[in-house]
UniProtKB/Swiss-Prot annotation:
This is Protein GrpE. GO terms for biological process: protein folding. Keywords: Chaperone, Cytoplasm, Stress response. Residues 14-58 have a biased composition (Low complexity). Signal peptide: none annotated.
Amino acid sequence: MSEFNKDDYLNDLPDPSDAEAAAQASSGADASAESGSAQDSAAQAPSNEGADAAPAAAEGEKTGEGQSDSADTLTPLGKAKKEAADYLEALQRERAEFINYRNRTQKEQERFRQHGIIDVLTALLPALDDIDRIREHSEMDDSFKAVATKIDKAFEKFGVEKFGEKGEDFDPTKHDAILHKPDADAEKETVDTVVEAGYRIGDRVIRAARVVVASPQN
């Protein structure tokens, strides 16, 4: 067994200055590693933030468009346009109602007018029949003829038409046959004699003509 040498032991111990330098070197390496890791994290962070920011920006644009549309309806111009459209629609409805009312009123007025004429004509029918008989069976003096002509023109002015002529085809819608007379020469039913003239306004028959009908022999 070798003898313990104190001087050799002391020489083998590490120098305090060398140990301190080694410690400083180790600390610097660790700090460099941490700094590199931090820089890598910082480099990745903007990339992630950019990826997350894109959908958020798109969503913000959509939200902005919705807010813009909503805000447009609330602007004075948007309100004015809406009010103008409402007023136009109401005006068109009122105009249509007025036109319908005017048409109904005109029809009512024409109906009342015709009723008034019919009432007057009905009241004068006996006198008109007497005038026609005088014309047919006797000579009328000039003064009486002038009065009869004025009466006829007055009724024509109000749309009253006299009808019923000898020889015309018999029509049960406007002729009232008081007698059917067989006629060997007749090929169809015709008016042989007008007893009382008929009167109508337009297509409306006020009184059918009273006639004698010539009928074909069987």
